[in-house]
UniProtKB/Swiss-Prot annotation:
A biological process from GO: glycerol catabolic process
Protein name per the record: Glycerol kinase
Positions that bind glycerol: 82-83, 135, 245-246
Taxonomy, superkingdom: Bacteria
Alphabetized SUPFAM superfamilies for the sequence: Actin-like ATPase domain
Family: Belongs to the FGGY kinase family.
Keywords, ordered alphabetically: ATP-binding, Glycerol metabolism, Kinase, Nucleotide-binding, Transferase
A GO cellular component annotation in the UniProt record: cytosol
């Protein structure tokens, strides 16, 4: 049997390639950052060719670094930033515009117009599981077709293709032979029906998107096509797993059972609860999404997306310049007994779940003459935990049962102050896995299952072990007192950007 699986992890700020062996040991990692493009306030773009160049180069680099040839790779799995939208020319393979990133708010006006259409908000919620928001791919596709010269005409002639980042990478890896996505990524577009598992005709009509642009939707674990990683005529490696980053992390955490919850602390924060084969409609502002698609069947999940999680730490470092390194936050946060009454609401691009307020903006409240740098840093870290509690409360309200623990991963999960505060604030155990690269691991698992590298989910579940556990150690009364103040701070940030 071939020895290794390669996971391509295409994220919001960097492209990574990670090689795993059968015992899920990490053999090698390569990573390259790429440019963030901000053409106007609230707009965020990436260059699709730079995404591809960085992703392919880290793949080559990690193989060379570990002295591994393609003969030893059983399969490639792909996980990606979701919702980010790329439209390219079918014949030349050249993108007609930059990738519009999930964080980008440029289509807020389109969303406002769509909200006026009879019954559309409810239809979207009922059939796509999503809320009508600029976050998702549908309105981004419409914007490109409406604003790039000649785009709509080319699309009508069947000359343009749309894809989320996974589709783009598969297209490039297979030299334009394969145009696919998986159920998890499709479920984030706002044009995919999560009940009948097909592109939704009404949504395509409402957004005026030709069906010919869309990729074929496949399972999250199957062979989609082959990549040639060496010289022409060399051994072809199967591309055999695809999942959006948050669903991949859920799978990588072995959260296979109904009621399992994970939170990924990345640029944003993403809480997912596996609801099994039950499609739970949220009453609390959460998304209903597809957790995974295997063997033509799907498991569903409830998701709460927090737009600014770890990004608040980047803001402290890059814009306020009150820390020089992200890891400094833990040190400074513990230099004060508490937040000094200061609350930071990092609604830089609006508020995600459960509020869905595109016009909210960041606020710092509770400042006094005695407030110092440490209070601001601590309150910024705490904001990540508060937003997580907002989402967790909504989830428990929707499903009608409690949970025992949260499995955590992502960059900010390395911050022990934050993890302890998180446990204190929600009153649940917080568990870190030994392998924290759960997103890449999920993609590796999916690819490995498709080619028989791992036999089944049961084998994978036995590989999952906890590295650290955090138990709550504050009273219920104190927990609720903190949270009440947070809710007050949230109210201050809402609807700030609405013009009077």
């Amino acid at each position: 049997m071939k020895k290794y699986i390669v996971a391509l992890d295409q994220g919001t700020t960097s492209s990574r390639a990670i090689i795993f062996d059968k015992e899920q040991n990490i053999i090698g990692v390569s990573q390259k950052e790429f440019n963030q493009i901000y053409p106007r306030e609230g707009w965020v773009e990436h260059d699709p060719m730079e995404i591809w160049a960085t992703q392919y180069s880290v793949l080559q680099e990690v193989m060379a670094k570990c002295n591994i040839t393609q003969e030893n790779i059983a399969a490639i799995g792909i996980t990606n930033q979701r919702e980010t939208t790329i439209v390219w020319d079918k014949n030349t393979g050249v993108p007609i515009y930059n990738a519009i990133v999930w964080q980008c708010r440029r289509t807020a006006d389109i969303c406002d117009d769509l909200k006026e259409r009879d019954g559309l908000v409810d239809y979207i919620r009922e059939n796509t599981g999503l809320v009508l928001d600029a976050y998702f791919s549908g309105t981004k596709i419409k914007w490109i077709l409406d604003n790039v010269e000649g785009a709509r005409e080319k699309a009508e002639k069947g000359e343009l293709l749309f894809g989320t980042v996974d589709s783009w990478l598969v297209w490039k890896l297979t030299n334009g032979k394969v145009h696919v996505t998986d159920y998890t990524n499709a479920s984030r577009t706002m044009i995919f029906n999560i009940k009948n598992l097909e592109w939704d005709e009404r949504m395509l009509k409402e957004l005026d998107i030709p069906r010919s642009m869309l990729p074929e939707v496949k399972n999250s674990s199957e062979i989609y096509g082959y990549a040639n990683l060496g010289a022409k005529g060399g051994i072809r490696v199967p591309i055999a797993g695809i999942a959006g980053d948050q669903q991949a992390a859920l799978f990588g955490q072995a959260a296979f059972n109904k009621g399992d919850v994970k939170n990924t602390y990345g640029t944003g924060c993403f809480l997912l609860m596996n609801t099994g084969e039950e499609l739970v409609k949220s009453k609390s502002g959460l998304l209903t999404t597809i957790a995974i698609g295997l063997h033509g069947k799907v498991q569903y999940a409830l998701e709460g997306s927090v737009f600014v999680g770890g990004a608040v730490i980047q803001w402290l470092r890059d814009e306020l310049r009150i820390i020089s390194d992200s890891s400094d936050t833990e040190y400074f946060a513990t230099k004060v007994e508490d937040n000094g009454g200061v609350y930071v609401v990092p609604a830089f691009v609006g508020l995600g779940a459960p509020y869905w307020d595109m016009y909210a903006r960041g606020t710092i409240v509770g400042l006094t003459r005695g407030t110092n740098r440490n209070h601001i840093i601590r309150a910024s870290l705490e904001s990540i935990a508060y937003q997580t509690r907002d989402v967790l409360e909504a989830m428990i309200n929707d499903v009608g049962y409690d949970i025992n623990c949260i499995k955590v991963d992502g960059g900010a999960s390395r911050n022990n102050f934050l993890m302890q505060f998180q446990s204190d604030l929600v009153g649940k155990k917080v568990i870190k896995p030994i392998i924290t690269e759960t997103t890449a691991l999920g993609a590796a698992y999916l690819a490995g299952l498709a080619v028989g590298y791992w036999s089944d989910k049961e084998e994978i579940a036995k590989l999952w072990f906890a590295s650290e556990e955090f138990e709550p150690n504050i009273s219920e009364e104190r927990r609720n007192k903190y949270y009440k103040k947070w809710k007050k701070a949230i109210e201050r940030s809402k609807e700030w950007a609405i013009e009077d």
